Each structure stands twice: as structure tokens, then as C-alpha cells.
Amino acid sequence: MNDKYDIVVVGAGPAGSMAARAAARSGANVLLLDRRREIGVPVQCGEALSEDPLKDLGIKPDPRWIAGKTNAVKIVSPSGIAVRISEKKVVGKMGYILDRKVFDKHLAMLAAKEGADVRVGTVVDGLLMENGKIKGINAHGIEGRLEFLADVVIAADGVGSRIARWAGINTALKLVDIESGVQFQMVGIDFESSSTMEFYLGSKIAPGGYAWIFPKGEDMANVGLGVLGSRAERRPAIQYLQDFVKRTPDLQKGKIIEINAGGVPVGGPIKRTVKDNLLIIGDAARQVNALTGGGIDYAMRAGDIAGDVAAKAVAEGNVSEKRLNEYEKRWREKMERSLERYLKAKNVLISLSDEDLDELAKALSKIKFENISLTAMLKSLLKTNPKLLWKLRGLV
């Protein structure tokens, strides 16, 4: 491997691998590196993804990394009122439950096939600076100390990005802006349907967040939850999850075969994702759905844009903030409105009491699948619960 590259991408999650793939495809000399010795391990999310980003980015679904397919959602209120929504009827798309251990490796392989070098077990220790400009990274690996020069560094190093912080960008998170997530992979459990994703709401279940059951086969599922740091009452997330498993009949016979945990940023994107010689993507840029905590879709799209912009900038010999700002403009045009909408929805959701959530579930249960929409929900509430409708005004 070289020690001089056009672009170094730090972090081989979906964002980083897509950035490396796009940049290498455009002719750049790219290094993709990750601190883990095995890409995709440990898993740090529920592993749900819609088919849209795969279609849009030209990635053919592969049964090796699709653990389950979903076509419906069940939402359960604090008192047990269940609302069932058909994904196909309402949004016209299929959902997948991934095997991230295989999926993440697959994306890194796509980058490698386009010509990117890939290094695992390589920990970045700092940025190489020259006259105030980023010129590469310091790292260490099994060989010892390492230096890689680069015209552009792409930070895909996750929540609380050290790369961004070293570059002078504030990555500190308030308690209200981060969820602590924990997940069990369980076997031997019962399902209402192996194609239905289940979500459970309530302050006793997951304060400020929700619990989930995502099927991964006939009797296996990801069972997890996220709790908002400002609402957790000093209890670790795993205690809430253990309680959820104990009180949920479908899970009581199940056995835990894996535990994963991590933090999820739910406070909206950082203000700036570009500096001279630097782009910030994925969880590092907090490009995450604040309502669900899902970030794979946004990460892949942002990575693809970043890799394309970085490669073009290098080819032009101009890697200034002004030139790289094309990335900032493109990702915000494509994603910012959606991210803002979900952030508003999250803020409304955490303001609701358990009684409010029950009333909301009652209203939703009266709407036909074909008519599920924000407008239909608000019309139903106008008839049944105008007081709750006022609390939901922030959604409009």
C-alpha cells in the first residue's frame, strides 16, 4: 500500500465505504481504513433498511446479507393498543432486516473492487497538519506507527467524531440529543408475523425512545430499545431492555445469543460538515433520523455524495472549503428537509404522556391502511381528541 493518497476515508461503516466506492469509481486514489479488525463487528443498530437507498445507489440485494424482509409495521402504545400498518399499501416499498456483519463487509468490498485500498485494525491518532491545513492522518496498526498523506480526509468515524473534533468542529452532544441503545439478538421466540416490524412506546418501556422487535427468520429477532439520556432516570438502557423482555410474552421463551450497544445522535445534523481538505459524513455528521434513530440510508447517500465531490475536487486541484462545499449543498438539498421533519416529530413525541400516546394509537387505529397519512391522522384527532391535536401542532 502507498503512504500517499488522494483521499483517506476514516471508518468503514456504510457512510465510509460508500464514500470510498464513489471516489475510487471517479478515478481517485483512495484509502479506506477502520479501527476494527473485522468490518461490521460489533453491530450497533437494529439493522433495518428500506429498499430505496439500495435501488438509488445501484446495490443489488443479496440474500447473504438480508436476514429478513418486512412488509408491515405494528406500533404498540403504553397500554397495549396495537396499530398495524402495511408498508406496501402505505409507502409502496419493501423493508429489509440486514445482517450488518455481512452487509458492511459487502459495501467495503464494493469500494475495494472499484480500486480503493482497505486497511483494518488501524487506529487514527491524529491529523497531519501543515500551515493550518489538513495533510493526512497519523495512525497505528499491527506494524506500529503509520502516516498517510492525503489531499482530502473524509471523517466517517461515528458519533462524537474525533476527526471532526481535531479539526476544530464541536461534536459535543447534550443528553437530550443522544439515545443510549442496546440490543439482544434472540432465538426461540414467537412471532405474530415474521414479516412485521414491531415498535413499543411508553415511559416505562423506553423513556424518550421506543423498543423494537425486528424479525430475522422464523424464530430469531433483534430485540432492542433506545432511551433518551435526559429521560433515563439514571437507569442503564440494558435494565429497561431486560424488563421489556420479561414483560413481553412473545419473548419470554427466547434465548439471548448476542448483545450490542451504542449511542445514537438524535439532535439533528451538525452545523457544518466541510472544511478545507475535510468532509464529515454519516453518524459523524449526525445525519440520522431523530425519530427512529435510523441512519444507514442517510449515511449511504451522504457517503456517495462526499466521495463524488472529493474525487472531482482532487482532480481539479482545488480542495478548499469553498470547492468542497458542493457536498454540503448537495446533501442538505437531498436530506435536510427530511431530517428536520423527523427531528420535529421526535420533539413532539417526547412531549407526549403515556395517556397521550394511547389516545394517538386509538386515533390511528380508526384510519384505514390506504389512508394512513399525517392529514388523515389529524382529521381523526380533530373529531376524537382536539386537545391532543393541539399538542401535535408541531408536526404541521
Protein language model annotation of sequence segments:
Residues 2-15:
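Beta1/beta-strand and adjacent pyrophosphate-binding region of the FAD-binding site
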Residues 8, 24-43:
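Glycine-rich FAD pyrophosphate-binding loop
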Residues 15, 38, 160:
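Conserved Rossmann-like nucleotide-cofactor binding loop
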Residues 26, 110-252, 286:
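Predominantly flavin-linked oxidoreductase catalytic cores and closely associated redox partners
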Residues 36-58:
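Conserved N-terminal glycine-rich FAD pyrophosphate-binding loop of Rossmann-like flavoproteins
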Residues 52-106:
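A conserved beta-strand/loop capping segment in the N-terminal third of enzymes
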Residues 231-309, 315, 321:
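FAD/FMN-dependent oxidoreductases across multiple families
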Residues 311-396:
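C-terminal helical "tail/cap" subdomain of flavin- and related membrane-associated enzymes
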